[in-house]
UniProtKB/Swiss-Prot annotation:
<dbReference type="InterPro" id="IPR036052">
    <property type="entry name" value="TrpB-like_PALP_sf"/>
</dbReference>
<dbReference type="GO" id="GO:0000162">
    <property type="term" value="P:L-tryptophan biosynthetic process"/>
</dbReference>
<comment type="pathway">
    <text>Amino-acid biosynthesis; L-tryptophan biosynthesis; L-tryptophan from chorismate: step 5/5.</text>
</comment>
<dbReference type="GO" id="GO:0004834">
    <property type="term" value="F:tryptophan synthase activity"/>
</dbReference>
<dbReference type="InterPro" id="IPR006654">
    <property type="entry name" value="Trp_synth_beta"/>
</dbReference>
<keyword id="KW-0057">Aromatic amino acid biosynthesis</keyword>
<protein>
    <recommendedName>
        <fullName>Tryptophan synthase beta chain</fullName>
        <ecNumber>4.2.1.20</ecNumber>
    </recommendedName>
</protein>
<dbReference type="GO" id="GO:0005737">
    <property type="term" value="C:cytoplasm"/>
</dbReference>
<keyword id="KW-0663">Pyridoxal phosphate</keyword>
<dbReference type="InterPro" id="IPR023026">
    <property type="entry name" value="Trp_synth_beta/beta-like"/>
</dbReference>
<comment type="function">
    <text>The beta subunit is responsible for the synthesis of L-tryptophan from indole and L-serine.</text>
</comment>
<dbReference type="InterPro" id="IPR001926">
    <property type="entry name" value="TrpB-like_PALP"/>
</dbReference>
<keyword id="KW-0822">Tryptophan biosynthesis</keyword>
<dbReference type="Pfam" id="PF00291">
    <property type="entry name" value="PALP"/>
</dbReference>
<comment type="similarity">
    <text>Belongs to the TrpB family.</text>
</comment>
<comment type="subunit">
    <text>Tetramer of two alpha and two beta chains.</text>
</comment>
<keyword id="KW-0028">Amino-acid biosynthesis</keyword>
Length: 392
C-alpha cells in the first residue's frame, strides 16, 4: 500500500493488481522527469493535438447573463474535441516507453474512449475500450468514431450499465493482461499513481491559462469554474492556481433531477468517504455501504465517486463544490450556443449553468474563466430527442 499525503487516495487493490500498480508507480517516477519523454510529449501535443488552445472572451454571453468578464478555456478545440486527449496521449506514450503493445480504457461520455483510440492509432498500439451499455446507446457518434479508429468497443451490460461498470471490466482485463497491456485510466482517480499521472498530463491546461490571462489582463482570474465528474478537467484547470488563495476554485457536479429525487451524481452534496475502484474518496453509498446508482444527463459526470485531490480540497476549503441540474445545464447549453456560436458539451454546460446562477451578483470588473472541457457534437442526438420547449 502506498502512503498518500492526505487520507484520500491510496491503492486498495486485489492481490493480482498489486504488482502491476507497483511497477507502474516505479516507472512513472522515472519517466515524469525524463527529458526525452517530456520533449516527445510536448512535440506531440503541439504538432498533433493542437496545443495551446485559445482563451476566448465571450462578451455576448456575459451580457446575456448580466455578468462580469467571462473567458472560456477552449479545450473543445483540441483534436478529438475535448481535454481527454492530453491524458490519453501522455499515457499511451508512457505505454510505449514501458514496452506495452495494448491499451485498455474505460469511457462514459465516449470522449476518453475516442481520445485513447486516437492516441493508439497514432502511436501504433492495440486498443480496447469498455463502455456501459446505456452510454453506448446515448453516445453513438463517439462509439462509431472509436470503431473507425480501430478500437474494439466492448458494451458492458453488468450492474447499472454505466461508467463504474466499465471501470470494473477494464480493471478485470488489466489484471490478466498487464504483462503486455497498459490501463489508460481517464480521470484523476483510481489507485495511486493514477491521480498523479492524470493531474500531471492535464495540468497543461492551467499552465496555458495562467500565461494567457496574464497576457490579456495582467493578473490571475478571480474565479475558475469547471464541471466535475471524476475530476480530471477540473484538477488540470485548477492546478497552477491552487497556490494563490485569492483565486476562487469552483467545481460543479451533476445534479441530475435534483437532490430530493435521488437521481443525481452529487458526491459532495450527499456522499461520504469510502473505498471504490481502488481509492478512498467521497462516494455515493447507502447506509450499508453499497454504492448507489447515479444519474446525470451528462455521461461524463455519471460516476459515484470523485478524485482524491478534489476530496482533499473540499475538506480543506480550498475549493467550493456545488451542482447544476440537468435542466439548468440544458439552458446554459443553449445560452452559450445562441449568444456565441459555440456548442459546449453537456459536461461543460454544468459549469456554465453555475456561472449563470451567480453572474448577476458578481462585480463587473471581476474575471471568471470557465473550462470548456469539450464540444457538444456528441450530445446533439440526445438533446434533439428531448423536449424542444426548454429552449424555444
Amino acid at each position: 500500500m502506498f502512503k498518500h499525503k492526505h487520507p484520500f487516495g491510496g491503492a486498495f487493490l486485489p492481490e493480482e493488481l498489486l504488482a502491476p500498480i507497483q511497477n507502474l508507480k516505479a516507472e512513472w517516477e522515472i519517466l515524469k522527469t525524463q527529458q526525452s519523454f517530456l520533449s516527445e510529449l510536448d512535440c506531440i501535443l503541439k504538432n498533433y493535438a493542437g496545443r495551446q488552445t485559445p482563451l476566448t472572451e465571450v462578451k455576448n454571453f456575459a451580457r446575456a447573463i448580466d455578468g462580469p468578464r467571462v473567458f472560456l478555456k477552449r479545450e473543445d478545440l483540441l483534436h478529438t474535441g475535448a481535454h481527454k486527449l492530453n491524458n490519453a496521449l501522455g499515457q499511451c506514450l508512457l505505454a510505449k516507453y514501458l514496452g506495452k503493445t495494448r491499451v485498455v480504457a474505460e469511457t462514459g461520455a465516449g470522449q476518453h474512449g475516442v481520445a485513447t483510440a486516437t492516441a493508439c492509432a497514432y502511436l501504433g498500439l492495440d486498443c480496447v475500450v469498455y463502455m456501459g451499455a446505456k452510454d453506448v446507446e446515448r453516445q453513438k457518434p463517439n462509439v462509431e468514431k472509436m470503431r473507425f479508429l480501430g478500437a474494439e468497443v466492448v458494451s458492458v451490460t453488468k450492474g447499472s450499465c454505466g461508467l463504474k461498470d466499465a471501470v470494473n471490466q477494464a480493471l478485470q482485463d488489466w489484471a490478466t493482461t498487464h504483462s503486455f497491456t497498459h490501463y489508460c485510466l481517464g480521470s484523476a482517480l483510481g489507485p495511486l499513481p493514477y491521480p498523479d499521472i492524470v493531474r500531471f498530463f492535464q495540468s497543461v491546461i492551467s499552465a496555458e491559462v495562467k500565461e494567457q490571462i496574464h497576457a490579456v489582463a495582467g493578473r490571475d482570474p478571480d474565479i475558475l469554474i469547471a464541471c466535475i465528474g471524476g475530476g480530471s478537467n477540473a484538477i488540470g484547470f485548477f492546478h497552477h492556481f491552487i497556490p494563490n488563495p485569492k483565486v476562487q476554485l469552483i467545481g460543479v457536479e451533476g445534479g441530475g433531477l435534483g437532490i430530493s429525487s435521488g437521481k443525481h451524481a452529487a458526491r459532495f452534496a450527499t456522499g461520504r468517504p469510502g473505498v471504490f475502484h481502488g481509492f478512498y474518496s467521497y462516494l455515493l453509498q447507502d447506509d450499508d455501504g453499497q454504492v448507489l446508482q447515479t444519474h446525470s444527463i451528462s455521461a461524463g459526470l455519471d460516476y459515484p465517486s470523485v478524485g482524491p485531490d478534489h476530496a482533499e480540497m473540499h475538506e480543506s476549503g480550498r475549493a467550493f463544490y456545488t451542482l447544476a441540474t440537468d435542466e439548468e445545464a440544458l439552458r446554459a447549453f443553449f445560452l452559450l450556443t445562441r449568444n456565441e456560436g459555440i456548442i459546449p458539451a453537456l459536461e461543460s454546460s454544468h459549469a456554465l449553468a453555475h456561472l449563470v446562477s451567480i453572474a448577476p451578483s458578481l462585480p463587473k470588473e471581476q474575471i471568471v474563466i470557465v473550462n470548456l472541457s469539450g464540444r457538444g457534437d456528441k450530445d446533439l442526438p440526445q438533446i434533439i430527442r428531448r423536449n424542444r420547449g426548454i429552449y424555444e
